Amino acid sequence: MVELSEKVSGLIYQLRIFMPMEPGYVFSYIVKRDNECVMIDAGYPNAELLNPLINELSKISNCRLSTLFITHMHIDHTGLANELRNRLSLSIVMHRRDYEQVLKMLDRDLFIKEFLELLGQYGVPNAEMELYRNVTSGLSSRRRLSALNPDVLINNEEEYIERMHVLLTPGHSPGHISIILDEYKLAFTGDLILPTITTHVGLTPINPGNPLRDYLNSLIRIRKVDLKCLYPGHEGEICNVNDRINELIMHRVSRLCEVVNTLRNNELTIFEITNMLKWMDDKKYVDLDPMNKYMALTETAALVKYLESIGIVKAGNDYKYGIIREIMCDIRELIPQ
């Protein structure tokens, strides 16, 4: 259920923590310098995992654990934060932008209301509304099961805390952070960059604005840091850092072009575009389970928002989008370099 392994001798330890949803586990990390330790992320909210997690932590010798960094607000990264603080007297650190969204989710009725209003703009038919009401209600309920009350809120795009270089890298969430060990050229990137999975970037009430633009800028920001390896929240370490970042950028270019091609001869709502794209395992929207329908719809919304922001598409009064500037779907037309 919880497994400890040493990733970089005497410096980085990884905790593999079970969770009951894909991909089945999440990583937390311990960074040890001298006898001082900090923890990065707090696993899934399952009280039965708390004692096994603490037992695994005790296997790291001469490790005075003082601080818990939260890379982002999602419950598989915040789950046991309060319990760990209570048992180990930790200080919890996260970015203010994410904490503000945590507070928003705790008001379930308001959260559902805002999302249903957004669905109207996405062109979702009434027949689908109950499905999305249930999904958003479930997200809010799970959030309340894992209440989070940080001790330190990061306010800036870049800070140094406990000798850790913290960068704001939004997109997956508004206040997602990456944590860099400058002297080793190593970083902990939460869900920003994963080895084979493409991170969900969706436009929702708790990830507002232009999240795909934020995500692409975050990838480019990390690419400029010159890192040897990344330690993400799932799958495994990444040591072909820039190659993987370039793959992820090209994946988004491909998806943006799919949206553009879908709109070449039609004006469509975001819901209609979502139905015309292929999703996980090459499935159509209609074949997805409710949670993956939510992810597909909100990802399409983020793609369309990005295209709108660079002047390629525009919506009419009926929320149907059409092309207003033709492009060849070249990366230089779509992505800031």
What are these regions (language model features)?
Residues 48-49, 56-160, 274:
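Active-site HxH/HxHxD metal-binding segment of metal-dependent hydrolases
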Residues 21-23, 154, 170-173, 337:
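A short catalytic or substrate-binding loop motif that flags glycine-/basic-rich loops and adjacent residues
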Residues 11, 31, 41, 72, ...:
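Divalent metal-coordination and catalytic microenvironments
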Residues 78, 215, 300:
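Aromatic/hydrophobic pocket-lining residues that form the small-molecule binding cavity
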Residues 2-59, 178-195:
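Conserved beta-strand hairpin/beta-sheet module of binuclear metal-dependent hydrolase folds
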Residues 52, 73, 77, 242-264:
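Active-site/pore-lining binding-face segments in mid-to-C-terminal subdomains
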Residues 261-337:
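C-terminal regulatory/interaction regions
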Residues 37, 44-46, 140-142, 165-256:
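Metallo-beta-lactamase
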